[in-house]
Structures are given as structure tokens and as C-alpha cells.
Amino acid sequence: MADRVRKPEWLKINIGANDRYTETKRIVDSHCLHTICSSGRCPNMGECWGKGTATFMIGGDICTRSCKFCNTQTGRPHPLDANEPTHVAESIALMKLDHAVVTSVDRDDLPDLGAGHWAHTIREIKRLNPQTTIEVLIPDFQGRMELVDLVIEANPDIISHNMETVRRISPLVRSAANYDTSLQVIGHIARSGTKSKSGIMVGLGETPQEVETIMDDLLAVGCQILTIGQYLQPTHRHYPVAEYVTPQQFATYKTIGLEKGFSIVESAPLVRSSYHAEKHIR
């Protein structure tokens, strides 16, 4: 199977730990915070933490969904931590971040699916860090646009929602998520005037034509920024890698995406949703 093939050289990284990495880890740990960097086993954690940046994950570290590509734990989440928004905001201040990225687990167990907690977190970050720009990577909120509006009204600078993969593969790997619902969420964000962003993985068995189709679908609803990265199987229990896409093909996807009309396309094997996110605010 493809997932048992040795990873190509371009996917080998050196995590390395400099003083900034150690300090970032200390701040995250001391505030009892969760990051998608560690829970998602992000290949860029060494680089990002070494620069003093991290993607904070709110709502706890247990997700109500069980997507076949994701390493985040699935189960019954704990009650929300009312102090979490302040802890995240304080950590951002300690890290002296110019740009902060926040994501969350899915909280389908909550009446508002966690949208109120999202809005509180954004406002608290703004209160303690008025000069910091904010990007949020949100769940689909089951397509309930009144909940998406709670996030929009908190006024982050960029709102991202990941399509994850092409239409054909989406039902095979996404738990309780729907391709068209995700498009509707992104379109709703774009129509609000907020800068919109989405991300996909490749290497799941999609074709280049399917990648172009999802680009067209995203552009049709107003998406401005696209990230494309290689899917890496977290464990043997997860969906297998079908292909290791070459750096040349990633470069081709970037060229195609820009020609089609995206304002920014990040496309490379190790690209993840928040990779170089600080550049997307410009």
C-alpha cells in the first residue's frame, strides 16, 4: 500500500528546538492550552514554534467528530473552560505575536456548537492585544449561518474553513461534514466582507482535474486564499496515503490557482492551513 512506501526526501524535516521553541512550549504548557501543532502532529511545529508562533486550539482537545485524516482525539468533550479565552489572549501577549491563529475542535455536543466561545475568545484576544491581527479556522457549525455570524461579528481579520479534499473523496474521510455545506459556509463568510480562506490536502487519491474543480468551486463562492498540502497518515488506523505528490505538481497547482483568481495560494508538500499565515493578512 502507498502509505507503507518510504516517504520521499522532500518530506523529511528536522524539528530542532531553539530557545524560542522552548519558550513557546513553556507558555503554551503553563497556560494549560492546546495547539493543533502538537495534537495534529504538524510537520511545521519546529519551524513555527522556533519563530515564536503557534496555532491555538480552543474548545478542549477532544473532538465530537472522527475524520479519517485527523489525529485529534475523538470522544465526549469536557465542559468548556470559561478561562480559556483569557488564557489564549494572555499567551498571545507573552509571545508578542503580530498575527495570531486560532482553531477549534468540533463541539457538536453544545447548543451553539461552540460559536459563543469562539466569539468570546476573539474579543478577548482583541482586548489584550489590540495591535494583533487574528485569523480563525472554524468548523462548519453544521451549516447554521446564525452561528457563523457570531464569529463574523467578533471581527477577526481572516476567517478560514477547510474543504479538506475534493468532492468525491470528502464523504470517505470527513465525519459529519458535507462538501456543499462547507462551500456555503465559505460563501457566507466572503459575502460578509471578511477575508475568506480554505485549505485542502492532496495525496488522498484525487486527480489534478478534481483539484482544479474544487478551486473553481471555491472561487465561485468568493474564497480569496487557498492552501494546498500533502496528506500524511497520522497512524495506521487513519486513511492511507494514496500518493506523495511531487513538489513540481504543487508548484503547478499554485500557478493554476493564481491564474484562476485566488489572491494567495500556498502550495507545497509541508503546507498546512496556518503555514505562513502572517503573510496572508497583507
Curated annotation (Swiss-Prot):
CDD domains: Radical_SAM
Keywords from the UniProt entry: 4Fe-4S, Cytoplasm, Iron, Iron-sulfur, Metal-binding, S-adenosyl-L-methionine, Transferase
Radical SAM core domain ranges (all copies): 49-263
Residues that hold [4Fe-4S] cluster 1 according to the record: 37, 42, 48, 274
GO cellular component, one term: cytoplasm
GO terms assigned for molecular function: 4 iron, 4 sulfur cluster binding; lipoate synthase activity; metal ion binding
Pathway the protein takes part in: Protein modification; protein lipoylation via endogenous pathway; protein N(6)-(lipoyl)lysine from octanoyl-[acyl-carrier-protein]: step 2/2
Reaction(s) catalysed by this chain's protein: [[Fe-S] cluster scaffold protein carrying a second [4Fe-4S](2+) cluster] + N(6)-octanoyl-L-lysyl-[protein] + 2 oxidized [2Fe-2S]-[ferredoxin] + 2 S-adenosyl-L-methionine + 4 H(+) = [[Fe-S] cluster scaffold protein] + N(6)-[(R)-dihydrolipoyl]-L-lysyl-[protein] + 4 Fe(3+) + 2 hydrogen sulfide + 2 5'-deoxyadenosine + 2 L-methionine + 2 reduced [2Fe-2S]-[ferredoxin]
Pfam family name, one: Radical_SAM
Residues that bind [4Fe-4S] cluster 2: 63, 67, 70
Keyword tRNA processing carried by entry: no
Main localization (coarse): cytoplasm
Cofactor note: Binds 2 [4Fe-4S] clusters per subunit. One cluster is coordinated with 3 cysteines and an exchangeable S-adenosyl-L-methionine.
NCBIfam families reported for this sequence: lipA, PRK05481.1, PRK12928.1
Family named by the database record: Belongs to the radical SAM superfamily. Lipoyl synthase family.
Official protein name in the record: Lipoyl synthase
Organism: Bacteroides thetaiotaomicron (strain ATCC 29148 / DSM 2079 / JCM 5827 / CCUG 10774 / NCTC 10582 / VPI-5482 / E50)
